[in-house]
Amino acid sequence: MTGSRNASGKDPGLHIFTNMVGIGNVEVNAFQRLSQVIIQKSIREGFGLVVSEAMWKSTPVVAGATGGIPMQMADGVGGILINSVEECAAAVRRLLLDPRLGCELARAGKERVRQYFLLPRLLLNELQLMKKITGM
């Protein structure tokens, strides 16, 4: 973390977390809930949980439009999808300067997780599939 601290110019208002090793679930939960924005800038990503977890906790997300991320979060629903570092910086700045936008995205993101990714929805999908297969 020393390199990150040096890169931030020792700005006390800038907090960079690059390695969460040794940090427990309670702390990660607190970080995600208390953050104004979560950044998931991946160049390759499966269906990682960071994006969905942040949306469920009503925190807006700025994330790379790659891999499974767009399946979790449509642009403007939970956060902003980006393709470059410059777009990432602009999106973060936009959210920090417009907290109302962040709240709108966060609300939409939580609802998206509720609709598509929680256990009751997955069970309903399974039951519908079984019904279709069995012809009932």
Segments (PLM) and residue ranges:
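Nucleotide-activated donor-binding/catalytic signature segment of Leloir-type glycosyltransferases, i.e.
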Residues: 1-30
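Short alpha-helical segment that forms part of, or immediately flanks, the ligand-binding pocket
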Residues: 28-29, 52-56, 70-71, 77
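A short, well-ordered alpha-helix in the C-terminal region of glycosyltransferases
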Residues: 101-115, 122-128, 132
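A short alpha->beta transition loop at the rim of the catalytic pocket in nucleotide-sugar-dependent
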Residues: 36, 58, 65
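Aromatic "clamp/platform" in nucleotide-sugar-dependent glycosyltransferases that forms part
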Residues: 43
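Short hydrophobic beta-strand element within catalytic cores of glycosyltransferases
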Residues: 60-63, 73
